[in-house]
């Protein structure tokens, strides 16, 4: 099953790698395992500034990158498919595109399940109950099940930014304050 057209915000490199990983995982019946590994990797990436710097640094040779991702995968207990995927990405010097690959994989997997992907940005972490309410509300709007990816960004101060496909709803306090500031400038 060829998969395409995930998003305009994902690079072609990231989409091609993610599509290849998804198709392999689908053929091997390993989509849930690979998804779990991707989620754990994303959590590691979110928590570690060193890991972020490593994947974005052109200073390391391909051999050093392969060795480092092998050690990371072994320590994290990633499955064989995801470990081999990381090694191929490192060998081809594409580690910088890993965040986009994770995002593209999630979108492709959601499309395969007949879901719509939504990116939620919140000033604070959402509870499971809030996530479920949000999913239900978005399902009412889209008519499809919704897979959400929540990002915490304290700079929005409050509220949410919701992106579904090419649509965005910005109810953040930062945006409301900016709008108010512009309105006051026009009056004064």
Curated annotation (Swiss-Prot):
GO molecular function: proton-transporting ATP synthase activity, rotational mechanism
InterPro entries: ATP_synth_OSCP/delta_N_sf (IPR026015), ATPase_OSCP/d_CS (IPR020781), ATPase_OSCP/dsu (IPR000711)
Topology in the lipid bilayer: Peripheral membrane protein
Top-level taxon in the UniProt lineage: Bacteria
Keywords: ATP synthesis, Cell inner membrane, Cell membrane, CF(1), Hydrogen ion transport, Ion transport, Membrane, Transport
Compartment(s) of residence: Cell inner membrane
Quaternary structure and interacting proteins, as annotated: F-type ATPases have 2 components, F(1) - the catalytic core - and F(0) - the membrane proton channel. F(1) has five subunits: alpha(3), beta(3), gamma(1), delta(1), epsilon(1). F(0) has three main subunits: a(1), b(2) and c(10-14). The alpha and beta chains form an alternating ring which encloses part of the gamma chain. F(1) is attached to F(0) by a central stalk formed by the gamma and epsilon chains, while a peripheral stalk is formed by the delta and b chains.
Record family assignment: Belongs to the ATPase delta chain family.
Classification via PANTHER family: ATP SYNTHASE DELTA CHAIN
Protein name as annotated: ATP synthase subunit delta
The gene coding this protein: atpH
């Amino acid at each position: 099953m060829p998969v395409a057209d995930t998003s305009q915000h994902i690079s072609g490199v990231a989409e091609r790698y993610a599509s290849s990983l998804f198709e392999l995982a689908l053929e091997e019946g390993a989509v849930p395992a690979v998804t779990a590994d991707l989620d754990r990797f994303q959590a590691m990436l979110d928590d570690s500034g060193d890991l972020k710097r490593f994947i974005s640094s052109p200073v390391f040779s391909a051999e050093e990158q392969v060795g480092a991702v092998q050690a990371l995968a072994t320590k994290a207990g990633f499955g064989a498919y995801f470990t081999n995927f990381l090694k191929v990405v490192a060998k081809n010097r594409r580690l910088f595109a890993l965040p986009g690959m994770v995002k593209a994989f999630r979108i492709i997997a959601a499309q395969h399940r007949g879901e719509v992907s939504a990116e939620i940005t919140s000033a604070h972490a959402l509870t499971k109950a809030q996530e479920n309410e949000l999913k239900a509300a978005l399902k009412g709007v889209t008519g499809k099940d919704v897979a959400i990816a929540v990002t915490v960004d304290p700079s929005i101060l409050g509220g949410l930014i919701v992106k579904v496909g090419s649509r965005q709803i910005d109810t953040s306090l930062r945006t409301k304050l900016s709008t108010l500031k512009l309105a006051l400038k026009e009056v004064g």
